[in-house]
Curated annotation (Swiss-Prot):
Residues 32-372 are lumenal. This is N-acetyllactosaminide beta-1,3-N-acetylglucosaminyltransferase 3. Belongs to the glycosyltransferase 31 family. The chain crosses the membrane at residues 11-31. Beta-1,3-N-acetylglucosaminyltransferase involved in the synthesis of poly-N-acetyllactosamine. Has activity for type 2 oligosaccharides. Also acts as a core1-1,3-N-acetylglucosaminyltransferase (Core1-beta3GlcNAcT) to form the 6-sulfo sialyl Lewis x on extended core1 O-glycans. It is an enzyme of class 2 (transferase). GO terms for molecular function: beta-1,3-galactosyl-O-glycosyl-glycoprotein beta-1,3-N-acetylglucosaminyltransferase activity; N-acetyl-beta-D-glucosaminide beta-(1,3)-galactosyltransferase activity; N-acetyllactosaminide beta-1,3-N-acetylglucosaminyltransferase activity. Gene3D superfamilies: 3.90.550.50. Glycans are attached at residues 64, 184, 202, 362, 367. It catalyses: a 3-O-{beta-D-galactosyl-(1->3)-[N-acetyl-beta-D-glucosaminyl-(1->6)]-N-acetyl-alpha-D-galactosaminyl}-L-threonyl-[protein] + UDP-N-acetyl-alpha-D-glucosamine = 3-O-{beta-D-GlcNAc-(1->3)-beta-D-Gal-(1->3)-[beta-D-GlcNAc-(1->6)]-alpha-D-GalNAc}-L-threonyl-[protein] + UDP + H(+); 3-O-{beta-D-galactosyl-(1->3)-[N-acetyl-beta-D-glucosaminyl-(1->6)]-N-acetyl-alpha-D-galactosaminyl}-L-seryl-[protein] + UDP-N-acetyl-alpha-D-glucosamine = 3-O-{beta-D-GlcNAc-(1->3)-beta-D-Gal-(1->3)-[beta-D-GlcNAc-(1->6)]-alpha-D-GalNAc}-L-seryl-[protein] + UDP + H(+); a beta-D-galactosyl-(1->4)-N-acetyl-beta-D-glucosaminyl derivative + UDP-N-acetyl-alpha-D-glucosamine = an N-acetyl-beta-D-glucosaminyl-(1->3)-beta-D-galactosyl-(1->4)-N-acetyl-beta-D-glucosaminyl derivative + UDP + H(+). Keywords: Glycoprotein, Glycosyltransferase, Golgi apparatus, Membrane, Signal-anchor, Transferase, Transmembrane, Transmembrane helix. It is a single-pass type II membrane protein. Disulfide bonds: none annotated.
Length: 372
C-alpha cells in the first residue's frame, strides 16, 4: 500500500504534464482565432529616417555692442537694432537636415523655398502641387524648405516639433537655430549657399522662391533645358534704378546706419528667380566676403555685382503678380498662367485651384491673351 500511495501522485503529475503538452502543441499547430499583436507596430519607414551624424555646434555668436554707441542706433526700430547687433553672425546650429538621398542622384532643378516656421499649410500644398518631387521630361526635381525658428519661445517649442515631424515624414526641411524674420531672409540665403556647397553642389539649376508663389515647374524645365548649368544664369523680374527706402514706416526701411549708398545694383525680385550651378557658386564666393544686407534680393544683386555678373529679366516670372488686360476678365484665369514660369503671390487655396485647372486635359484657351 505504501508503494501504491507513493506512485499515485507521480502518475497524476505525468497525466497533468501530458495534458499540458497536448494543449501547448495544439496551440502551436492551430492558428489563433484572432490576431494577437505580440509587439508594437513598426514605425513607418518615413518616420524611421536615421538621424544624421551630429556636428559640433557653432560657438554662440555674441552681440556687437559697439553698435550701441552709434549716434543713430537708439532711434532705430527694434528689428533694425537687432540686425545691427548680430549682423556679423553667420553660423548657426542646423536643427533639421535632409537625408543624403536628397541629392544622391543628379538633380536637374532644386526647388529651394523660403518658409516661415508656422506656414505648414503652404508647405503641404506645395508638396501636393507644383513642388512635388518627380521627374519632368526625365529630369529630377527635388524640394527643400528653408526655415528658422519662431521668436516666441512657447511658439518655438510647438513649431519646432511640427518641423521635426515634417522632416521625418518628408525629408525636405532645412531648419537653422536663428529667429525667422524678414530681416533674416538674407541669413537664410547665406546658410543655404554654405549648405549646398557640401550637400547638393551637383544640382544643375535652382529655383529660389517664397512659399506663396505659384511655379509652373514643367515650363521651367522646358526653359532650362536650353541652358548650360556651367554658365551664368540668373533670371527673374528685374528691378533696377532704385535705392534704399528711408521712410521709417516701410517694411523695406533701410537707414543710413546700415548703408550710406543711395543706389542698389540691379537685382531680381525675391519672390522667385532661377539660377544655374555656376551662378550659385559665384554667389557663395561673394556672400563670404560681403557684409550681410537686410534685404535678401538686393544682397544677391550685390553678390552678382561683386562677381562681375548681371541678373536678367524673364517675362514669364511675375513677382508682382498678373493683371488682366480688361476689368471684365479675371486675373485668376488659368489661361493667363499656362505659359508663365512663376507668379507671386497666391493664397493657399488659390494655389491648389490653379494647379488643378492647369492640369485639366480639357483646358482650352484659344489665342494667346496679353497680360500685364
Amino acid at each position: 500500500m505504501k508503494y501504491l500511495r507513493h506512485r499515485r501522485p507521480n502518475a497524476t503529475l505525468i497525466l497533468a504534464i501530458g495534458a499540458f503538452t497536448l494543449l501547448l502543441f495544439s496551440l502551436l499547430v492551430s492558428p489563433p482565432t484572432c490576431k494577437v499583436q505580440e509587439q508594437p507596430p513598426a514605425i513607418p519607414e518615413a518616420l524611421a529616417w536615421p538621424t544624421p551624424p551630429t556636428r559640433p555646434a557653432p560657438a554662440p555668436c555674441h552681440a556687437n555692442t559697439s553698435m550701441v554707441t552709434h549716434p543713430d542706433f537708439a532711434t532705430q526700430p527694434q528689428h533694425v537694432q537687432n540686425f545691427l547687433l548680430y549682423r556679423h553672425c553667420r553660423h548657426f546650429p542646423l536643427l533639421q537636415d535632409v537625408p543624403p538621398s536628397k541629392c544622391a542622384q543628379p538633380v536637374f532643378l532644386l526647388l529651394v523655398i523660403k518658409s516661415s516656421p508656422s506656414n505648414y499649410v503652404r508647405r503641404e500644398l506645395l508638396r501636393r502641387t507644383w513642388g512635388r518631387e518627380r521627374k519632368v521630361r526625365g529630369l529630377q526635381l527635388r524640394l527643400l524648405f528653408l526655415v528658422g525658428t519662431a521668436s516666441n519661445p512657447h511658439e518655438a517649442r510647438k513649431v519646432n516639433r511640427l518641423l521635426e515631424l515634417e522632416a521625418q515624414t518628408h525629408g525636405d526641411i532645412l531648419q537653422w537655430d536663428f529667429h525667422d524674420s524678414f530681416f533674416n531672409l538674407t541669413l537664410k540665403q547665406v546658410l543655404f549657399l554654405q549648405w549646398q556647397e557640401t550637400r547638393c553642389a551637383n544640382a544643375s539649376f535652382v529655383l529660389n522662391g517664397d512659399d506663396d508663389v505659384f511655379a509652373h515647374t514643367d515650363n521651367m524645365v522646358f526653359y532650362l533645358q536650353d541652358h548650360d548649368p556651367g554658365r551664368h544664369l540668373f533670371v527673374g523680374q528685374l528691378i533696377q534704378n532704385v535705392g534704399p527706402i528711408r521712410a521709417f514706416w516701410s517694411k523695406y526701411y533701410v537707414p543710413e546706419v546700415v548703408t550710406q549708398n543711395e543706389r542698389y545694383p540691379p537685382y531680381c525680385g525675391g519672390g522667385g528667380f532661377l539660377l544655374s550651378r555656376f551662378t550659385a557658386a559665384a554667389l557663395r564666393r561673394a556672400a563670404h566676403v560681403l557684409d550681410i544686407f537686410p534685404i535678401d534680393d538686393v544682397f544677391l544683386g550685390m553678390c552678382l555685382e561683386l562677381e562681375g555678373l548681371k541678373p536678367a529679366s524673364h517675362s514669364g516670372i511675375r513677382t508682382s503678380g498678373v493683371r488682366a488686360p480688361s476689368q471684365r476678365l479675371s486675373s485668376f484665369d488659368p489661361c493667363f498662367y499656362r505659359d508663365l514660369l512663376l507668379v507671386h503671390r497666391f493664397l493657399p487655396y488659390e494655389m491648389l485651384l490653379m494647379w488643378d485647372a492647369l492640369n485639366q486635359p480639357n483646358l482650352t484657351c484659344g489665342n494667346q491673351t496679353q497680360i500685364y
